[in-house]
């Protein structure tokens, strides 16, 4: 197995759904299924914050979600927890700046997908040099899902990454909705990552379909 190519990674980032049990008001397994039917291209398991599952329950829930992703042939990524990603033989892991260092993550994950959240050009360059396959850049817009976010960057912040010669695949993160998706892609992102735009939508299926349409229209 070799590392994923830039072109393949770029395609996978199109509509990146992130979810944990506490991000849904409906059955999360049903929400994920609808999102997959609607066309998400990659999924990240992020079980964090108030009311999040822990221990064995968390692992069992992750396995259920992973099995559904497998049915649809969509990569299953674990947020932050490298050990869980290895235990589940997940397709990859996504880490932030305060999580385990990228060098040791890459070492442990082998050729699997490694994504890194970055807020500055320096962080981006460090992540690229040490084995990141893609960057999560944001928050682009204000978000209520994550309580520990850095300052909002806007689409200008994202465009700045491209202007500074960062060519690695980038997914925009933070406060992204159907209405503002086009502006994120136009600023230079390969895709958008969303939580509530899908998890809290009246129809997760319809919402995903609209996101997919917006991304392909703007690319």
From Swiss-Prot:
Keyword Transferase listed: yes
Segments passing through the bilayer: none
Keywords: Magnesium, Metal-binding, Thiamine biosynthesis, Transferase
Binding sites annotated in the UniProt record for Mg(2+): 80, 99
Main EC class the enzyme belongs to: transferase
Cofactor note: Binds 1 Mg(2+) ion per subunit.
Enzyme Commission (EC) number: 2.5.1.3
Catalysed conversion reaction: 2-[(2R,5Z)-2-carboxy-4-methylthiazol-5(2H)-ylidene]ethyl phosphate + 4-amino-2-methyl-5-(diphosphooxymethyl)pyrimidine + 2 H(+) = thiamine phosphate + CO2 + diphosphate; 2-(2-carboxy-4-methylthiazol-5-yl)ethyl phosphate + 4-amino-2-methyl-5-(diphosphooxymethyl)pyrimidine + 2 H(+) = thiamine phosphate + CO2 + diphosphate; 4-methyl-5-(2-phosphooxyethyl)-thiazole + 4-amino-2-methyl-5-(diphosphooxymethyl)pyrimidine + H(+) = thiamine phosphate + diphosphate
Lineage top rank: taxon: Bacteria
GO biological process: thiamine biosynthetic process; thiamine diphosphate biosynthetic process
Residues at which 4-amino-2-methyl-5-(diphosphooxymethyl)pyrimidine binds: 44-48, 79, 117, 146
Record-linked NCBIfam families: thiE
UniProt-listed PANTHER family: THIAMINE-PHOSPHATE PYROPHOSPHORYLASE (PTHR20857), THIAMINE-PHOSPHATE SYNTHASE (PTHR20857:SF15)
Protein name, UniProt field: Thiamine-phosphate synthase
Species in which this protein is naturally found: Bacillus thuringiensis (strain Al Hakam)
Gene expressing this chain: thiE
């Amino acid at each position: 197995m070799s590392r994923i190519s830039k072109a393949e990674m770029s395609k996978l980032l199109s509509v990146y759904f992130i979810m944990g049990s506490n991000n849904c008001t409906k059955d999360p397994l049903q929400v994920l299924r609808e999102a997959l039917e609607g066309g998400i291209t990659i999924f990240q398991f992020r079980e964090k914050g108030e009311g999040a599952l822990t221990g064995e329950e968390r692992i069992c829930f992750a396995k259920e979600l992973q099995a559904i992703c497998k049915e649809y042939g969509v990569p299953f990524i674990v947020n932050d927890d490298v050990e869980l990603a290895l235990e589940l033989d997940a397709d990859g892991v996504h880490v932030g700046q305060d999580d385990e260092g990228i060098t040791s993550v890459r070492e442990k994950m082998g050729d699997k997908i490694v994504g890194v959240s970055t807020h500055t050009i320096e962080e981006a360059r460090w992540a690229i040099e040490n084995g990141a396959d893609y960057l999560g850049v944001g928050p682009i817009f204000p978000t209520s899902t994550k309580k520990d976010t850095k300052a909002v960057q806007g689409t200008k912040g994202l465009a700045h990454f491209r202007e500074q010669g960062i060519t690695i695949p980038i997914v925009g993160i933070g406060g992204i909705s159907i209405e503002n998706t086009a502006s994120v892609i136009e600023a230079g992102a390969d895709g958008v990552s969303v939580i509530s735009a899908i998890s809290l939508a009246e129809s997760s299926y319809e919402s995903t379909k609209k996101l997919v349409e917006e991304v392909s229209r703007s690319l």
